[in-house]
Each structure stands twice: as C-alpha cells, then as structure tokens.
C-alpha cells in the first residue's frame, strides 16, 4: 500500500495533474512492483502565500510525500526516487531542483483498509521488494 500526496502551486499543478499522476504511477509500478490497478494519489493545490519554497527553486516547485508500508529495500526506494526525478522532469516539465520527494514508512498494523488492520489483510502483491 502507498498513498502519495503532491503539493504545488495551483496554477502550475493543475495543468499537469494527469501527467504527474501517470508518471508517479509508472514509477511505483516499476520500482515497488505494484499492481497496475493500485493508484492512490492526492493533489494539494496551494495558493500563493500558502506555499513557500527554496530560493533555488521556481514556482514549479513540487513536493511528493509517499506514505507506505515498511519492508521495501533501500535499493527499491532509491530506484523509486530516481524514477520520479526522471519521469516528472520529462513528463511534467519540472527541473530536479524543483522536485522534493519524501518517503515515510510505517508498520502494516498502523494502516486500516478493507475493513481490517493492514497486517490482517492479504495483499495481491509483495512488499519486500
């Protein structure tokens, strides 16, 4: 399971939202071996004055916060980050200094879905990749 939040200025996020979602999804499927039908992305459109970013970035600055079960290898997480930089830059007109990625991992028992705690749900994919 992974939940992905995307933050950016409304005027620069809205026009590329679908391309960003597609790029994110392709990265998660490849790096974490997610099933193609597992997509959970939320876009947070910020207004100027509510979103401050580093001086080294432009108004295109975009933050990706990924929350997922613990258990993925360091290599898989690094591959996900590298793929996100490559594909978001390519498909959504961002530069590397305009992208920030954070991954937060929590135990399965801290999740709840399909009516049960996450550690009691049988998944159709592997977490230990």
Model-found features: residue ranges?
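Interaction-mediating elements
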Residues: 1-129
């Amino acid at each position: 399971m992974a939940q992905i939040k995307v933050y950016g200025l409304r005027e620069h996020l809205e026009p590329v939202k679908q391309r960003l979602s597609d790029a994110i999804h392709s990265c998660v499927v490849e790096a974490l071996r997610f099933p193609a039908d597992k997509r959970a992305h939320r876009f947070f459109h910020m207004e100027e004055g509510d979103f401050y970013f580093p001086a080294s970035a432009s108004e295109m600055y975009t933050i990706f916060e990924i929350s997922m079960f613990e258990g993925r290898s360091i290599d898989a997480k690094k591959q996900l980050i590298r793929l996100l930089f490559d594909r978001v830059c390519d498909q959504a007109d961002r530069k590397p200094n305009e992208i920030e990625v954070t991954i937060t991992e929590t135990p399965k028992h801290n999740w709840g879905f399909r009516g049960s705690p996450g550690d009691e749900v049988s998944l159709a994919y592997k977490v230990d990749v």
